[in-house]
Amino acid sequence: MIAISYLLLTLFLAGLSLWLWPRRVGRHAGARGALNASLVALLLAALSSLLLTFGQWGASSAAMADAQRIFGLAAQHISLPLLGLATVYLARGLRWKPMIWGQVILGLMACFELSRYLGWQPGYHWLVNLIGAAGLLASAVLYLSRDKRIAGLCLIAPVSLIAPTLFSQQLPLTALLSAEAGASWLLPGFVAAALAVGLLAEQAHNSDNACPSNDSTTAPR
């Protein structure tokens, strides 16, 4: 059953990545950057899940284990923060220079290494994932009266990805680092987050033709 959970997660994440890709067309540069960041988040989780699937089927080696650990750690610390930030960005109609998304990813990686060096990794792990969950919840509140589909998806995602860890007393998204029965909770969480990003990207204020009121933000009212 664990292998099936990871296989389904891999397939859904890959499919959602293919679904998100064409939604970049017609979006302004910043919105395309948010979609690209979301694709990075989904693909990191997909690669980690794929390697865990192979491991469950007995197709493991030292090189594969090392690769899985790298992608697993990256997905644990980058995927949810990027998805949460992307939903807030698209929900508010913010306009950053596209390069800022690359800087965000590099910043998350640098802070992870610093947290390991200082021995603060568990605290940093919780911090970045709670920030991602907070971003999704904020987007749910913003769209509660505008589009209940988006609000519902932004609520389902953090509940599925974070809530189970509160009861099991584990770090968030540990099922992306090692094979666990709790992997089944990841599927609805990542699916909901990806769908929310896609629907938010289609909002009028994120189109290439939308005229920003200034260079930094264009918030929906």
Features from the language model and the residues they span:
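Aromatic-anchored segments of alpha-helical transmembrane domains
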Residues: 44-51, 105-116, 156-170
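C-terminal transmembrane-bundle signature of multipass membrane proteins
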Residues: 139-221
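Membrane-proximal helix-loop-helix units in multi-pass membrane proteins
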Residues: 72-144
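Non-cytosolic membrane-interface motifs at loop->transmembrane helix junctions
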Residues: 62-74, 122-132, 175-186
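N-terminal topogenic module of multi-pass integral membrane proteins
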Residues: 1-70
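Hydrophobic cores of alpha-helical transmembrane segments in multi-pass inner/ER membrane proteins
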Residues: 5-18, 75-90, 132-142, 185-204
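Membrane-interface helix-boundary motifs at transmembrane edges
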Residues: 22-38, 89-100, 142-152, 206-208
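Juxtamembrane "helix-exit" motif on the non-cytosolic side of transmembrane helices
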Residues: 22-24, 54-62, 112-122, 164-176
